[in-house]
């Protein structure tokens, strides 16, 4: 008898596919921040197509990593606490954004990450934030990291850096 068929219920390495979509629970504020970041991306490129939320997040994460490297090179660091501390209205004023609708409050929003690389990058960023004790480990969840990345992207880079 040939043993070419694996037993039922077993998983072969060839049948495992990377996760390409992941829903992350966020505050409703994240949806608004994504629209503001998308507007900034469209304004800074010649592409008039609206970017997807995942594209916006990937661009913002790349920008934040560049900010972090520049801050390290200047023997400084990003002031994560200052970026996350204010409420949304105060943040909008700090980042020179239009005022956000009051209805956003803390209602939930499901952000769907698309792409295995982005999913992996967001979870790796959460691990880095926890490892460096930037925030309490309980706070460093994907939804919080997404909000942080979008806020850093929308702030003036000089305001986000701290010597």
Identify the residue ranges that each predicted region occupies.
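Short, basic amphipathic alpha-helical segments that act as recognition/interaction helices
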Residues: 44-78, 129-163
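Short Lys/Arg-rich basic patches
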Residues: 2-42, 82-124
């Amino acid at each position: 008898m040939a043993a070419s068929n694996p037993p039922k219920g077993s998983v072969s390495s060839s049948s495992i596919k990377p996760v390409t979509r992941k829903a992350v629970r966020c505050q409703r504020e994240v949806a608004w921040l994504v629209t503001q970041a998308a507007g900034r991306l469209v304004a800074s490129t010649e592409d008039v197509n609206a970017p997807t939320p995942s594209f916006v997040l990937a661009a913002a994460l790349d920008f934040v990593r560049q900010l972090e490297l520049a801050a390290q090179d200047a023997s400084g660091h990003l002031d994560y606490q200052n970026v996350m501390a204010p409420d949304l209205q105060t943040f909008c004023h700090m980042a020179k954004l239009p005022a956000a609708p009051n209805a956003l409050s803390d209602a939930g929003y499901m952000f769907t990450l698309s792409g295995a690389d982005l999913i992996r990058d967001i979870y790796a960023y959460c691990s880095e934030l926890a490892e460096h004790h930037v925030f309490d480990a309980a706070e460093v969840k994907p939804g919080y990291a997404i909000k942080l990345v979008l806020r850093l992207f929308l702030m003036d880079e000089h305001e986000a850096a701290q010597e």
